Amino acid sequence: MTEKRRIACFFTAGYTELNAMKAFMRKINDTVEYIQLCPIGPRKSRSAIQNRHIDRIDKNQNGMTGEKLIQFVLDFIKEKRFEEEGYDALLIEDDKDNRFLSIEENGIAYIDENRWKCFKDGVAECIRERYPSIPVIFFYAAPEVEAWFLADWENSFGSVYKNTFTTQQNDYFSVKFRKYVNDCILTDRYKNCIEKYGYFEGKYRKLSEEIQDVLERIDFLGDYMPELEHPIISYSKKIQGEDMLERIEPKVILHNCTFFFKEGYWALQAF
């Protein structure tokens, strides 16, 4: 039996990605083995290693993103371990956040494809100084993984609270919250081009924080059952984020995330 090719995976070190990102990648290409090198849990005991669901991120990696993540990759490939373990490709997954955008005079952003290409070329060149032939896959969530959730609503915010709400409550919440997201968070500027989010009048708004804030401030069931008690919800990257990353379907996301996600999707599927 032919052994699966091995991909060294360096994911942005957040709790959404910790336990669920490999499974998400397998939905795109299940013919390879994904070795997660970042983020990992603390190495304290055999039982912790045997526990497939990790509760905490190693303190040296926690929150690693952007330049720190890239530097971690470049340092890791210099270790003897990387050479000995024999990887066939390298995958870097990160939140794009407010990078690789240029701001127009009206304060709205557009994707700076040249800046994105220069970034990838620079990182790949550093990696290939040591491993000239290794493929490097850049899989960036633009602006954050929450964009993927919004792109596949039915498998994310449309269903993640089903165990908290009744069926009727969930249906009402899903419709109301989706309308609010489109009208007030994404707005007409970005609801059809979510990967360009989120400069408004030259100031950047972080998508995950906007979602967390509105779910804390607004009771979307208040006008549905104002005189009755109903569950109060919130959004946590560690809880709902991980759950939704396990649920969402890459093929659905492709329809709405047509630049950064599409590039990573096809590169991974073709490997």
Features from the language model and the residues they span:
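C-terminal accessory helical subdomains adjacent to catalytic cores in phosphodiester-
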Residues: 2-5, 19-53, 58, 72-271
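Conserved beta-strand elements of the Class I
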Residues: 7-10
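Short acidic, Gly/Ser-rich segments with clustered Asp/Glu that frequently serve as metal-coordination loops
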Residues: 13-18
